[in-house]
Amino acid sequence: MIRSVVRGFGAALPKRVMTNRDMEQVVDTSDDWIVQRTGIRQRYIAGEGETTASLGEQAARAALANAGLTADDLDMIIVATSTPDNTFPATAVNIQNRLGMHHGFAFDVQAVCSGFVYAVTTADAYIRGGVAKRVLVIGAETFSRILDWTDRTTCVLFGDGAGALILEAGEGTGANTDRGVLTASLRSDGAHKDKLYVDGGPSSTGTVGVLHMAGREVFKHAVGMITDVIEATFKAADVTADDLDWLVPHQANRRIIDGSAKKLGIAPEKVVVTVDLHGNTSAASIPLALAVAAGDGRIKRGDLVMLEAMGGGFTWGAVLLRW
C-alpha cells in the first residue's frame, strides 16, 4: 500500500523578536503573568515586507533544501492559514509562483489552529489516492495583523511564522511499523464558533476584523477534545500511548499541553514544547515545533510521532505518523 512519508522539513520566522518585557510596554501585563498562565516567553512579529506568503516561501525553500529537492519535483502545494495575503488568490498559489513552480496545483486550507493537521490529512489522501506523488504542506500565519493590541488577554498569546513538510509516496506493508502517515482523525463542531473568532470578513463587514476569544471556554473544552481525538487515533492504528516516541501538540498554551499529556499518560520528556519560543502561531505551530525537534536530533527516523491541534470553529484533530 502507499504511505505518505516525510521527505523534508523547514521553518521560517520573522526578524523581530518581541519578549514579554517588550509586551509590558504595549499593554498592562507582566512577564510573570504571561509565563505562569501560558508558558510563553517571547514571540516573533512580522515587519514591513514580511507576509504569510513570504514566510511560507522561506519555510518551503528550507524544506526543499532539507529534502534535496527543487520545486520541479513537487506535484502540489497545500497551505494552511487563516491570515492570507489576499482574499484571493490563495496563498498557496502565491507561494507556488514565488518558487517558480508553474505545473501541478495549489490551494489553501482554513481550519485556524488545526489547519496543519487538516492539511497533512488532505495531502495524505491525495497521495494515497494516486493524484500526487510529492506534496509540499505549509502552515504559515501572521496573526499579529489580526490582533487587538489593546486586549491583553489575547495580544500576548500569538506570534507569526511558518513551517513546512514535504510528503512523498512510499511503499508500505499496511502495518503500523511502516514509515509515513499511519492514520488521522479530524473533528469540528460549529456550535462553538463564537468562542474563538475574528469579527470581520469580505461578505459580512467588508473588513479584516480582529481576534476575539473566550479564553476560559476554550480552555474548558480543549483538554477533553484533544485527548478524545488522540485516543481515537491510537485505536485506529492499534497502538497505545506507551508506543509513542513524541507528542507534537499545537503550541497554544503550556497548561493545555501539559494537561492533555497527563490525561493521556504521556511522559513530559516525550512532549515537544516550543510555545515559550514562538507563542501561538496557529497553523504554523506544529511544523515549527517539528522543525525544532527534528533539527536538533530529538525526532529521528522510525520514531512514532503524534501531531494534534484544536482551533476556532471548534476544529480539532490528530495525525499519527512514523518519521
UniProtKB/Swiss-Prot annotation:
Single GO cellular component term: cytoplasm
Family (UniProt): Belongs to the thiolase-like superfamily. FabH family.
Gene, per the UniProt record: fabH
Gene3D superfamilies associated with the record: 3.40.47.10
EC number: 2.3.1.180
PANTHER family: 3-OXOACYL-[ACYL-CARRIER-PROTEIN] SYNTHASE, BETA-KETOACYL-[ACYL-CARRIER-PROTEIN] SYNTHASE III, CHLOROPLASTIC
Pathway connected to this protein: Lipid metabolism; fatty acid biosynthesis
InterPro entries: ACP_syn_III_C, ACP_syn_III_N, FabH, Thiolase-like
Origin: domain of life: Bacteria
Official protein name in the record: Beta-ketoacyl-[acyl-carrier-protein] synthase III
Single GO MF annotation: 3-oxoacyl-[acyl-carrier-protein] synthase activity
Known partners and oligomeric status: Homodimer.
CDD domains found in the cross-reference section: KAS_III
Region entry ACP-binding, spans: 251-255
Gene Ontology biological process: fatty acid biosynthetic process
